[in-house]
């Protein structure tokens, strides 16, 4: 993604009222929604179509960024998500793309491929993913670090988006495009929760 063309929409909805936010009380819920390459003006343009308890609530009570930029080139989805979720640049989180060449071995590296884990509820060889190459903690990791009772869930259509956004300690799920249902890996669970 090109920096000028990239519009990142980050919504943080804090269910605690604004008065409790001013007193420093911990929010009961933090929701982080990233819509890659969505034009920021769409939030204002379509606000009349949003319900009071949906995106309209995010706009009124949360925070959204209409002009987010990265201070590095060349941006791409994986590096951008890692920067958003960790608060650091690629030299800090280790993600430069979904695939790259390790200059020390001249071997290709996939961001999330991890032969030490197994995909859950999917065909053999599918879903063998983890945050193996993500070298920084995400916001979710920090939330769990500060309070072990925190619930951190990352859900996305693709494993890269789910894993990079969720980090090391979240409950992470992504869509198995071949079978059309949510899956994860043994990095995150021994077995999938019953739905």
Go through each PLM region and give its residues:
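Sec/Tat signal peptide C-region and signal peptidase I cleavage site
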Residues: 17-21
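His/Asp/Glu-rich, glycine-adjacent segments
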Residues: 88-195
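Positively charged n-region of N-terminal signal peptides that target proteins for export
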Residues: 1-5
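Beta-strand elements within well-structured catalytic alpha/beta cores of enzymes
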Residues: 27-39, 58, 84, 143
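Extracytoplasmic/periplasmic, Sec-exported soluble proteins
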Residues: 23, 30, 35, 43-50, ...
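Short, structured active-site-proximal loop/turn typified by the sulfatase FGly-forming signature C/S-X-P-X-R
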Residues: 43-92, 151-155
């Amino acid at each position: 993604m090109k920096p000028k063309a990239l519009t990142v929409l980050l919504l943080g909805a804090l269910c605690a009222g604004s008065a409790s936010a001013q007193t420093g009380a911990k929010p009961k819920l933090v929701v982080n929604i990233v819509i890659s390459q969505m034009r920021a003006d769409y939030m204002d343009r379509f606000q009349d179509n949003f319900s009071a308890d949906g995106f309209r609530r995010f706009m009124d009570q949360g925070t959204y960024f209409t002009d987010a930029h990265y201070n590095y080139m060349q941006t791409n989805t994986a590096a951008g998500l890692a920067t958003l979720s960790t608060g650091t640049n690629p030299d800090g989180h280790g993600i430069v793309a979904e695939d790259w060449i390790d200059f020390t071995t001249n071997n290709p590296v996939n961001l999330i491929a991890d032969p030490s884990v197994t995909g859950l509820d999917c065909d053999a060889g599918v879903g063998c993913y983890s945050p193996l190459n993500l070298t920084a903690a995400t916001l979710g990791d920090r939330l769990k670090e500060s309070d072990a009772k925190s619930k951190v869930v990352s859900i996305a259509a693709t494993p890269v988006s789910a894993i990079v956004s969720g980090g090391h300690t979240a409950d992470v799920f992504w869509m198995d495009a071949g079978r059309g249902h949510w899956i994860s890996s043994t990095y995150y669970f021994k077995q999938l929760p019953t739905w």
